[in-house]
Amino acid sequence: MREFIFKANKTITSSDINLKDLPGSCGRLDLLCRCVSDAFFLSHDIRRDVVFYAVLYGQPNPPVCIKFVGSELKKVSPDERNIAIFIKKALKKFEELDEEQRKDWNQSTPGIYVRRLGFRNLVLEKLEEGKNIYYLHMNGEDVENVDIENPVFIIGDHIGIGEEDERFLDEIKAKRISLSPLELHANHCITIIHNVLDKKRICEI
């Protein structure tokens, strides 16, 4: 299983999403949608061994965590607008819940769940599950030299994850891994990680 946690610092936490302005008024929702697309979609198939978490910190009601489960997704397609519609449905579901209900995962559509959960608490939950935390950072160890097992990959948006959360990841001894000496788009990082792991899987067969 491959898991990704994407911290979306400015992405809207209201269902009032303007599908014609995903980058602007929706707080770079376009970037989140591209990450979801690259996390799951192959040319004529979908990756069923992937779980993707987006932790949204935009206004008006942060934080909101949306979980996408590849083995359960239905009717989701790779384009940004389609994915944004499903995110809108998840946020609408969240708005319909009281604060007690928001403590648990609630399904909005098949394979998509929503919950009140912040970035650090999500990472701690993954640690409790026995996952290994890998922070994608250009100054980390070359991914080709790292043995990746039972992974959760941490990815920041165009802003990054912030100094406080970087210190938190250092405190829990998250492994920093680098995909390139250059700064890459978040969705490109996901594609590269998949490629690295796909090749290793083929070599092991």
Swiss-Prot record:
EC number: 2.1.1.257
Database matches in InterPro entries: Alpha/beta_knot_MTases (IPR029028), TrmY (IPR007158), tRNA_m1G_MTases_N (IPR029026)
Chief subcellular location: cytoplasm
Pfam families (alphabetical): Methyltrn_RNA_2 (PF04013)
Broad EC category: transferase
Compartments where found: Cytoplasm
Reactions catalysed, as given in the entry: pseudouridine(54) in tRNA + S-adenosyl-L-methionine = N(1)-methylpseudouridine(54) in tRNA + S-adenosyl-L-homocysteine + H(+)
Signal peptide, first to last residue: none
UniProtKB keywords: Cytoplasm, Methyltransferase, S-adenosyl-L-methionine, Transferase, tRNA processing
CC annotations in GO: cytoplasm
Superkingdom, natural source: Archaea
Binding site for S-adenosyl-L-methionine: L136, G156, L179, S180, P181, L182, E183, L184, C189
MF annotations from Gene Ontology: S-adenosylmethionine-dependent methyltransferase activity; tRNA methyltransferase activity
GO biological process, one term: tRNA methylation
Protein role: Specifically catalyzes the N1-methylation of pseudouridine at position 54 (Psi54) in tRNAs.
PANTHER family tied to this protein: TRNA (PSEUDOURIDINE(54)-N(1))-METHYLTRANSFERASE
Protein family membership: Belongs to the methyltransferase superfamily. TrmY family.
Quaternary structure annotation from Swiss-Prot or TrEMBL: Homodimer.
Protein's name in the database: tRNA (pseudouridine(54)-N(1))-methyltransferase
Organism for this UniProt entry: Methanocaldococcus jannaschii (strain ATCC 43067 / DSM 2661 / JAL-1 / JCM 10045 / NBRC 100440) (Methanococcus jannaschii)
Top-level taxonomy: Archaea, Methanobacteriati, Methanobacteriota, Methanomada group, Methanococci
